[in-house]
Amino acid sequence: NRTGGTTPQSQAALRDYLRNGLEQLINNEDQFVIVNGDLFDSFTVDPLEVVKTARLFLRWLSKTNSRALNIVAGNHDYKPKADNLSSFHLLVHMLAFSEYENQVVVHDKELGRVCGTVWCIPHMPNQDLFNVEVAKAAEMDGKGRQLLLHCNYNNHFAQNSDHSLNLDEEQTAALLRAGWTLVFGHEHVGRTLHGGRVIIVGNPFPSSVIDCIGDVDKHCLRIQGGSPQLEHTWSAHENYIEADWKDLKIPDHYKFIRVIGEASAAESAEVIKAVSKLRQSHSAYVITNAVKIEGCDLSNELAGSIEDIKVFDVVGAIMSELTEQEQNVVKGLLQ
């Protein structure tokens, strides 16, 4: 459902590219595939996309009955007080109605074993329930085991958000003491911390320009013999480019383009026209405008990846100024 920096045609091409990338990844596996949350990037997507994704998984499952698909729920797969079915659960039902239903396992309720040495905590309805599951895992013997999580890692911007959960440093330390290796979904930019025992995989393929900035290589994670190893899936080289708005002769093999540079106020219309013309003529999936107009950034690229936007939490700021009793009153009004 990415729309920032796209046209209807490039949106369709972007969806095909992401789906084809997923199919290439799972076709390399003959036993277990795990999706660690947010297979889709919103609660509901075009039903045709759900159908295409179901067909993709069914083709893979049909090759041999030894294959198993484990799907973990992410934050986009759940909506509090939702009165309609998510695309995630629609996909799950479609797979359950197939002849391969016994090869599909859904993890959307609590801490549980996925397969082999792998366990998971799916996205939970709120931070308190998530904390309960984390505490359960911290009491277990996690030595030689991997715990999949779909949440932010130590992100204070997410501390008061139930939509996007957070694992803080104290919780991380408790899980590491228990012996776990932690594997995070949710965050788009990958990194490895704590001597390789905290692995933030990132997305295996970028879906926006934001995903390309500062993250020149993308990965998936293979867990074999109880040992997690990152495997390269995508490189910014020959795929992502930053180009000055005055020189937009860009080869077609670049699929993510960030238009940069500076312009005067009088040139602002020319900038918009140049970017629009490029979007209409180039085969790139996403083209964003990061040109600065007399010191003012006209960039719309932040809209391309909502997970990376750091918004000011008004409620959290107010709560921090109140006593505990006053906070309880406010919470009661908000419920």
State the predicted function of each range.
Residues 60-65, 137-142, 172-178, 251:
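Short, conserved loop/helix-junction motifs that constitute active-site signature segments
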Residues 33, 38, 53, 74, ...:
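Divalent metal-coordination and catalytic microenvironments
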Residues 2-4, 41-44, 71-83, 125-128, ...:
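Active-site environment of divalent metal-dependent phosphoester hydrolases
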Residues 53, 73, 77-173, 204:
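Conserved catalytic scaffold of divalent metal-dependent phosphoesterases
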Residues 31-33, 68-70, 116-118, 144-147, ...:
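Hydrophobic beta-strand segments of well-ordered beta-sheets in folded domains
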Residues 159-227:
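Conserved beta-sheet core of the metallophosphoesterase superfamily
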Residues 1-56, 65-66, 132-144:
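N-terminal active-site segment of His-dependent metallophosphoesterases
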Residues 216-335:
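Accessory, non-catalytic peripheral segments of nucleic-acid enzymes
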